[in-house]
A protein has these predicted regions:
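Positively charged n-region of N-terminal signal peptides that target proteins for export
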Residues: 1-4
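Bacterial N-terminal signal peptides
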Residues: 6-15
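N-terminal "domain-start" segment that seeds a small globular fold
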Residues: 23-30, 104-122
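A short beta-strand-turn-helix
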Residues: 39-43, 114-129, 154
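Immediate flanking context of iron-sulfur cluster ligation sites
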Residues: 39-55
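Local cysteine-cluster metal-coordination motifs and their immediate loop/turn environment
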Residues: 51-67, 137-141
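C-terminal cap of thioredoxin/glutaredoxin-like
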Residues: 73-74, 132-135, 141-153, 165, ...
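Thiol-based oxidoreductase modules, predominantly thioredoxin-like and allied folds used
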Residues: 158-177, 232-235
């Protein structure tokens, strides 16, 4: 009788077994280059997966969630973050902090309401995901992140749009207000994105004469551009944009919102892309 019960228990265990995988499905982790993840790194990744809880879809550790027969997409993304950051040399504490930031970015307590009408935009209005970046033409990191977001929009297509909000920061120098006013003048002339590109490509040449030269290079009509650049309405528009950003908690640039959700994570191309794809999953693409 005892032998029969043991046999029955083993049979039931086998029937239940398909709910768990034998190992992490490394090939399914988004944004992971498996050639960079040797066995030693994978072992470290598994340790972190066992220590971190999945923040959505699966109420268990990341490891338990990714080793199920049908792993939760959130867990797969979290595992991908872990591997990518280990490859980049981050510590377990760094990775834990980034995962917390990712959770806050994807599932905040409250979303911001941001008016994007009339703002510079790449991609269609009404896209599934709208990314708003508060940036400054004299901000060194904006020079990297804004073109990076535009490149991601080109890759992801019309599901995503990028909206640029001018937010001059005095710490970037007195010219930051001047270049932001020039940016709004370019927007009024319909040449903002070409101006955006030449301004960041010529980051160290933002005196007034060079701004005019770059506006001309961007195809702006210089007469109306100069008029708008120095107009009282342009100065007031910059004040309005600044007040709006401050009200949303923006203190530095670049600051990013994804469908009204403040982005707290790393601004590498891989992490930004993964966050945008996660948001597409959340809205059902």
């Amino acid at each position: 009788m005892r032998t029969c019960l043991i046999a029955l228990f083993l049979l039931l265990s086998l029937v239940a077994a398909p709910t768990v995988r034998a190992s992490v499905p490394w090939e399914r982790l988004p944004g992971v280059n498996l050639t960079e993840a040797d066995n030693g790194l994978r072992g470290k990744a598994i340790e972190i997966m066992k220590a971190e809880n999945c923040y959505y879809e699966c109420p268990d550790t990341v490891y338990s969630c990714v080793t199920k027969a049908a792993p939760a997409m959130t867990a797969l993304r979290m595992a991908g973050v872990i591997v990518r950051l280990l490859v980049d040399g981050k510590t377990p504490d760094d990775i834990s902090a980034e995962l917390r930031n990712r959770a806050k970015s994807a599932h905040p307590f409250k979303k911001a309401k941001i008016d994007t009408s009339g703002m510079p935009r790449v991609g269609p209005e009404g896209s599934s995901v709208t990314v708003v970046i508060y940036a400054d033409f004299d901000c060194p990191y904006c020079r990297v992140v804004s073109p990076r977001l535009i490149k991601l929009q080109h890759s992801l297509g019309d599901q995503v749009s990028i909206v640029f909000k001018l937010f001059p920061v005095k710490a970037h120098g007195p010219q930051s207000v001047v270049t932001s006013k020039a940016g709004w003048a370019a927007q009024l002339q319909g040449c903002f994105w070409a101006f955006h590109d030449v301004m960041y490509a010529n980051f160290d040449d933002h005196d007034d004469d060079n701004i005019v030269r770059l506006a001309n290079k961007a195809g702006c009509d210089l007469g109306p551009f100069k008029t708008a650049w120095n107009a009282k309405d342009t100065k007031e528009k910059l004040r309005t944009l600044k007040r709006e950003g401050v009200k949303l908690g923006v203190k530095s640039t670049p600051s990013i919102f994804v469908n009204g959700k403040r982005y707290h994570g790393l601004k590498t191309a891989a992490e930004l892309r993964d966050r945008l794809e996660e948001e597409l999953d959340l809205v059902g693409r």
